[in-house]
């Protein structure tokens, strides 16, 4: 999937910078997606996935069924798994990372950000609705493309596009 994404990006986009979560899978995805572009991959801790603490190795279905975590976290953005992060904490961290990236690049530059599903959904929810509570509205497939502009009123040009896969 990452190779196909890279092929699409090389053909259709001019990318000036790449940022990725430091977690291995994201970094590998960024490497495959930018092969041949001669760009360094900048890692930002703020792009990491939501930390689920004591529940980190559980499947999403287990979290939903056994702990009602998804409903509880969506209903209360300050709710967290034991020793984990709340949606509010994820929002603060991920939005700060996007703002940092935005500040380091000119308005006409295209920056590729490779992160994780929940982290990206939370960021999109904050940018469009000023709250992480609607993160569940934004399902993002692996290696899908979401393109937006961080202006005072953020603009989404594409969301979860995966026809290139």
Give each language-model segment a name.
Residues 1-28, 80-95:
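Loop-to-helix element that buttresses phosphate recognition and phosphoryl-transfer chemistry
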Residues 5, 39-42, 50-61, 103, ...:
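Acidic, low-complexity terminal tails and accessory targeting/binding regions
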Residues 28-34:
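Short Gly/Thr/Asp-enriched flexible loops that form oxyanion-binding sites at enzyme active sites
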Residues 32, 122, 126:
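Active-site signature of alpha/beta-hydrolase-fold catalytic machinery across serine-
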Residues 35-95, 149, 157-158:
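Phosphate-handling substructures
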Residues 107-117:
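Generic beta-sheet signal
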């Amino acid at each position: 999937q990452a190779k196909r994404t890279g092929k699409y990006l090389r053909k259709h986009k001019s990318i000036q910078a790449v940022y990725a979560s430091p977690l291995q899978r994201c970094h590998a995805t960024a490497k495959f997606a930018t092969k041949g572009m001669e760009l360094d991959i900048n890692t930002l801790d703020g792009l990491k996935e939501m930390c689920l603490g004591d529940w980190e190795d559980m499947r999403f279905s287990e979290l939903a069924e056994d702990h009602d975590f998804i409903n509880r976290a969506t209903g209360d953005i300050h709710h967290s798994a034991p020793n984990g992060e709340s949606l509010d904490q994820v929002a603060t961290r991920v939005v700060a990372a996007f703002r940092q990236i935005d500040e380091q690049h000119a308005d006409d530059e295209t920056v590729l950000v490779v992160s994780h599903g929940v982290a990206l959904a939370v960021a999109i929810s904050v940018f469009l609705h000023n709250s992480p509570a609607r993160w569940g509205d934004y399902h993002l497939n692996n290696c899908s493309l979401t393109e937006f502009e961080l202006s005072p009123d953020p603009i989404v040009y594409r969301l979860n596009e995966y026809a290139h896969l």
